[in-house]
Swiss-Prot record:
InterPro entries: CXC_dom, EZH1/2-like, EZH1/2_MCSS, EZH1/EZH2, EZH2_SET, PRC2_HTH_1, Pre-SET_CXC, SANT/Myb
Outcome, altering Y641C: In a patient with diffuse large B-cell lymphoma; somatic mutation; changed substrate preferences; prefers substrates with greater methylation H3K27me0<me1<me2
Disease: Weaver syndrome: A syndrome of accelerated growth and osseous maturation, unusual craniofacial appearance, hoarse and low-pitched cry, and hypertonia with camptodactyly. Distinguishing features of Weaver syndrome include broad forehead and face, ocular hypertelorism, prominent wide philtrum, micrognathia, deep horizontal chin groove, and deep-set nails. In addition, carpal bone development is advanced over the rest of the hand.
Tissue/organ expression: In the ovary, expressed in primordial follicles and oocytes and also in external follicle cells (at protein level). Expressed in many tissues. Overexpressed in numerous tumor types including carcinomas of the breast, colon, larynx, lymphoma and testis.
Encoding gene (name): EZH2
Annotated Acidic residues bias: 182-195
Protein name listed in UniProt: Histone-lysine N-methyltransferase EZH2
Nucleotidyltransferase among keywords: no
Triggers of expression: Expression is induced by E2F1, E2F2 and E2F3. Expression is reduced in cells subject to numerous types of stress including UV-, IR- and bleomycin-induced DNA damage and by activation of p53/TP53.
Species: Homo sapiens (Human)
Effect of S75A: Reduced protein stability
Amino acid sequence: MGQTGKKSEKGPVCWRKRVKSEYMRLRQLKRFRRADEVKSMFSSNRQKILERTEILNQEWKQRRIQPVHILTSVSSLRGTRECSVTSDLDFPTQVIPLKTLNAVASVPIMYSWSPLQQNFMVEDETVLHNIPYMGDEVLDQDGTFIEELIKNYDGKVHGDRECGFINDEIFVELVNALGQYNDDDDDDDGDDPEEREEKQKDLEDHRDDKESRPPRKFPSDKIFEAISSMFPDKGTAEELKEKYKELTEQQLPGALPPECTPNIDGPNAKSVQREQSLHSFHTLFCRRCFKYDCFLHPFHATPNTYKRKNTETALDNKPCGPQCYQHLEGAKEFAAALTAERIKTPPKRPGGRRRGRLPNNSSRPSTPTINVLESKDTDSDREAGTETGGENNDKEEEEKKDETSSSSEANSRCQTPIKMKPNIEPPENVEWSGAEASMFRVLIGTYYDNFCAIARLIGTKTCRQVYEFRVKESSIIAPAPAEDVDTPPRKKKRKHRLWAAHCRKIQLKKDGSSNHVYNYQPCDHPRQPCDSSCPCVIAQNFCEKFCQCSSECQNRFPGCRCKAQCNTKQCPCYLAVRECDPDLCLTCGAADHWDSKNVSCKNCSIQRGSKKHLLLAPSDVAGWGIFIKDPVQKNEFISEYCGEIISQDEADRRGKVYDKYMCSFLFNLNNDFVVDATRKGNKIRFANHSVNPNCYAKVMMVNGDHRIGIFAKRAIQTGEELFFDYRYSQADALKYVGIEREMEIP
């Protein structure tokens, strides 16, 4: 028993020693390889330079160059001295004047920064990348500053640990190198020195052969446990095991991750569902700024579950040709049944109270099942339901459709797609490739029953073949999203009266805590009202167009109906410190063409980027300053204050360093985030502080995002330096900005 306990205690320690020794060997081997590559590249570049130099020397010898004729005597010129220039070639010595330049005042100190035209969200830095140099004076005054700074990062400094670096390449090599050890070798320390030397020689002899080919069996769990104990930041043993599987599988030619869908245009295209085909688009596409790989919104909004009330493109109901599917018996009724079912049958709400009244719940057909084999039972249930409880609703639909269809067509609208199948001509036996089937499922969610348009987009199938494929897949295609008909549309005047009362309630809530402004996140509770549990209501934010609630939600901002410039408190958007939304404010000019220079609405400058031309020059107050090139009027937009969007905790950590430098570009955006223009920003970052400024800053809500705008506090003339109030205390103002600008005499 004692021997077993000794082995169990010795095992993990022995594996840790192996991990450390193999890791150091691989690191040293990697350094040697890197040094050899550098030497070979240096020798190659040196040889190319010598060859090129020899060619240029030969060209210079063949050219006939005449020296520039210069006066032999320059002593008569004031402030100059003679300077002779000699050449190794057969050129005579030249005498030229040497002029002395007067001393020039140096420009103010400027730290490097990257220009930005919009905000850029970054993650928190949990590791101190470098210890900033504050100068000897700062360290003498506060010797514990560096220690406190490191404590803010939990003692994590980049490059501080000896074994802190391990990338994917070294990780795979380390696991493969440790795979040559056996589990029975835990008691190697008890062997004789001669036996250990023999084992070490055998390992070194076979190491190169084993590293050159993949391991025969999967590495032991002890290897990953030992690596996890040596590198705890890299994850647990299970996570390292999964990572090793992914890295080794990706090395195989043509191997794809298990969740990856083959290219729809490639030879290995598969027939997959619509959600799987569009997974990458839904994941990478930002529905708030309409960009892929958005760097401003880390949490992408989910696709809207509501369908547009008015389609942007009109549907063409005419047959596309003599072979069009509309000439088939029952085809028009089939398309009309799909349209009627989409309008009449909204999807079920997950819990929550209904806000709208349906015509008759018993007449609504059940949702199609996914299993194709059970489609017959589902169809019989649907038919029974429509025959017993749906007669009144069918009559109402027939009366509405009489203008565009015949009575025979209207009588067949209650039938389901599967029941329509025996009435049409025998379908063609056409094979659909995986790419064509996947493309059809993608397009059916956009064009619904417009099979002619789907056929034109697919390109390899006729509209009749598309129609027959749609009938075949009726039981597995998800129902189309319902139109937003939960609540009847109110009249505009009554809607705005209710909105005014709602704004007064919100304003009363915000009076007690006016400084609490929280970041907006779209609410995602479709088919449920925005009550006290809604995140927008909790944060005292208005619901935006990106929320999943109904368009008639009482917490939604409806926009304005102004006919003027929207620059007074008569405009609801201006009163709510928001810019006019081009999707909501349709009468003030905010929805005009984006390239239009003369826009009647003056409350959409930030989103349009209508900034003024700014000039950078040394300031009379402190360091650099920013100056206006063209005159601006009072309350006119000048520029947006852009930079990195960081959290409040990250701003506290950075602010301690900026305070020591006595230079800070931090600007509070809301209670959650701060704009830092130190590393990235635009030219307005050089605007200095003043207690008598000519500009003012205002945080506005612009299409769901808080953004900082700089506006003119008074009329500003050409060439004036821009100032705005940093809201410093009196002590901080004297510490950071020692000189106050002179007041202009009116």
